[in-house]
Amino acid sequence: MKYILFSMAFIFLFTNCKKEDKQDPLLSQAKCVDINNPISISINDLITDIDTIGLEVTDSSLLGDIHMLHIMNNKLYILDTKGNAIYIFSRNGDFIRRIYHVGQGPEEYIRINGFQVDYKCNRLILTDSFSKRIFIFDEYGELLKVVPLKFSAYILMARNGGFLNFYTGPKQMYGLKDMENYNIHVLDSCGNFVASFLENQTPHRIDLESTERIDYNPNNEEILFHPTFGNVVYRIDKNNQIYPEYVFRNKSSFKLLTPKERREMTHIYGQKNEIEEKESEGYLLSWGCVYDLDDYCLFTMTGWNHPKHIYYNKSTGISVTIDMEKMKGDVSLCKLFNAPIYQTEGNCFYNIIPLYLVDELADKLPEGKLKTFLQNNNTPNSNPLIIKYKMKFPE
């Protein structure tokens, strides 16, 4: 009953908050993140404290296509979509175990679509959208429980004895209207739908899929969620109460979508791509990639082909915009650190460098630890390499 009442309250709340205007009282407490024109900066001045992790290669730990990385209790958990398995490594890269339960049996999955870590209970939450089930493992890879669902899930987090499901797929993904029209769904411990909140403001999207719209802080159990194309980033506390945390304020030459434009955005694969069209017209778009670090937040406005990064300093409230494609400095370093961010921890970022990029850049990098590391691991039998680093906030 409390979830139903909670849902009704927030349906009313967000129905009256469709205009993402800073004057709206619901947004008055949100922090303003200025979108400025990209600054001119060298990659050598931005990246600092570089460290490297080589993943041990054995007959059981040779990785193919790394899709996700999570860190819990000094262990690295890596989803390899090609191998359809979760690989567990120590923090320094020693192989521990592979989770591989492929099959048609009651305790077997067809394909892992995504996974999250449950820091509070030290568990792994694997989702299989094909069989519509959740597979829960302990931190060492032992299967604890299989939970059947009535819908396909991708990003699903353990929460208050149940789960939160985040709308991350194309339109008409769910059979229930209450799930289709709202971004976040509350599930009980058995995987049953209980309530929804945060209205979906992109009702016409078709083939658009987002994968990085949440960031979980294990210290306070809070989640940051950035709806597709939205100008507001929301905070969800450990009791599932939701608040506007950041609102973007445009001070750049880019254009942002109005609520009306966002509701009318359509993407039909092979037929119509309004995302690419809008970007070519000077719009700054986002799938909603947000990273919550100790001292600042990083918002990645991914658009279609030309990503921009917005860094927000929590202590000063100052934000800067960086276009990674127009960075100055060493070209090889620019290309290396333009790779996708897979995980954050404290003030550190983790990038996974595919072998083709290692082969291309190993001999071109400036002399030093990073170049030596890539050269020593540039073999056909190496695993993809992990780079851990910090970013020095631009002055």
Q: What are the residue ranges of the model-derived segments?
A:
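Blade-loop segments of beta-propeller domains
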Residues: 56-61, 65, 94-121, 128
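Beta-strand-rich domains and repeat architectures in extracellular enzymes and scaffolds
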Residues: 50-84, 288
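Short beta-strand elements that form the blades of beta-propeller/WD-repeat-like
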Residues: 75-80, 122-128, 161-175, 215-234, ...
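Repeated scaffold domains used in trafficking and secretory/extracellular systems
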Residues: 65-68, 110-115, 151-159, 206-214, ...
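Asp-box/WD-like beta-propeller blade repeats and closely related beta-sheet repeat scaffolds
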Residues: 129-181, 196-203
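Conserved blade-ending motifs and adjacent loop-strand segments that build the rim/top face
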Residues: 203, 245-261, 316-346
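Short coil/turn segments at the loop-to-beta-strand junctions that recur within blades
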Residues: 59, 100-107, 148-155, 200-204, ...
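Blade/loop signatures of beta-propeller domains
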Residues: 21-56
